Structure formats: C-alpha cells, structure tokens
C-alpha cells in the first residue's frame, strides 16, 4: 500500500493481493486517521458483500470469487472503542452483471485507487455493539 498526502486529502493505493478493509484499518492506525470519508475504484478477485437484515439484527453475506471491476467504492473510517473501524459499501461489475452491498471482505486483484479526506475539525466515533455501531458526533 502507498499513501500520498496533500493537506487533509490522501491518495491511497491498495496493492494486488491485499484485503481492502484490513489495509485501510492498518493505514488509519499508522496515519492517526480517526475520522475520514473515502471513495475509490479498482479491481477485485474476491468479495464478500451483504445486506443488513433488521429482523435478524445482523448481515446476510454472499461471497463471490471472480474478477470484477470496482464500479463504485464509498465508505468512512471512525473510531470504535479507540480503534479505527472501516465501514465500506461497493458496487462491483463483471460481464454485464453488477452486484453490491456492505463489504465484509474484498481482495484486490490489481490495484484499488482511493481518495480519502480526513475530517480535522469534527470528532466522530462509533458507539454500541457490532455489527452496526452507531455514529456519535461530538
């Protein structure tokens, strides 16, 4: 992974074979990122995406093992119990089909190019139990 900062903005390049959420969590820890939003594009070989089921109180996940483009990646990083918590959603496409949802795992196949913006003047954290801790501002 590579990171190139300019002010509160960073170009993050996640490399082939890296797991996206783990890489972003490590990046946040190493760069003291406590509050940020990000978006990006790239390609993957494997994803595990889901949707939150309100009645069950958890996510229902499906795993896909195929080469897909990241048509859209968006998310945020906020602290939960003092550690970076990455929350990401994605839209993935391959051979005329698209799928997406809440990202649980995402293995990069070539590169993932992310624009991340730190929120310098707003203190945001996550409070509550996993899998869906709520945002708390202030």
Question: For the regions a protein language model found, what residue spans apply to each?
Answer:
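N-terminal intrinsically disordered, cationic/polar leader segments
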Residues: 1-86, 91-138
